Amino acid sequence: MKYHKSFIVKGDYKNWKKHKFPFWAGEYTFSKAFGEWIEITSNIKNLYAKDLYKIHKKKHNYLQIDVRPKKEFEKFSLPQSVQCSGGELPCYINNKENLRKNYIVHCAGRTRSIIAYQTLKDFDFSNKKYVLNGGTQNWVLSGFNRKFENRSKIKSAKINYKDDFKLANSIAKKFKIPLTQIKSKNTNLYNFQIHSEIKNFKKITGWKQVNATTLIQSTDKFISSTNTKVLIFSNIPSSAVFTVIWLRRMGYQAIWQKSNARKIKKTYKLTKSDPTYFFPKRHLGNKSDSKGYLNWEHSLIPTIKKWGCKNPWVSANQKNLSKVQHSLHKIYKNF
């Protein structure tokens, strides 16, 4: 892998814990903690399951969006939900019909719905909006039934590429994110092509295809270096800008590859989903596991603060993302 220096920690993780150094436990913990941070530093408006149930019983103007990928939505979701993965929310909403609506976003738990809500703010959609607190897990904990065997209609969504490009440029300037149009031959970078569920675009050789929100909420499966440049390309410009904004908030050196994403000599192993070992029955209707998982998510930021890091990431309200630093540097400097 061309690393110049590598080391093995003597005594493995047990010795690490013995010295009371920071120690992660859980599932995609870094990304999950980041999601909790966004809720703390933004003005997230929560809607609770009982309130949503009441809304369902009357005529309303809410577009209720499950922001998970299509595959997850089709396993289970909520009554009245439509599906649009978080990275494609801006282009999905940016049309006359959907701009007349108000929005309720949800996932199975917390992280992706928090990201979706903040994204609606980032892209200047001023409509009334809410996060369903705790997602499908809290829905079940509140005594309501999920909807199974759903069929996503995301392929029927229409994209106005001119409007989307205009929106992407505007938001990129707003957050001062870096961009490039150079045909890079450098293979010592991370190259991601954002996978679209709305339209099948041609794969670019040497670029790893990944769902935008999956990349954000399970970053440790895709990016192992905290200071390597990360090029992001999408045939839907707003999806690329979405991804760059979120990666830079997390402290990664993400750059919008605005055009000229060329073929490169690079291969990847297939990224497989990990088995669910952590509160494994939380999506199977087990209330104890659902409650345990949601409580674990709430514990993440207090744990980081115990390590002496009061501001692990930038605030969700910060507009200037031209300079970023990974939170691991902020945490470890205290030890």
Regions found by a protein language model. Give the residues of each.
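Rhodanese-like catalytic fold shared by cysteine-dependent sulfurtransferases
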Residues: M1-L63, V67-N188, H195-F335
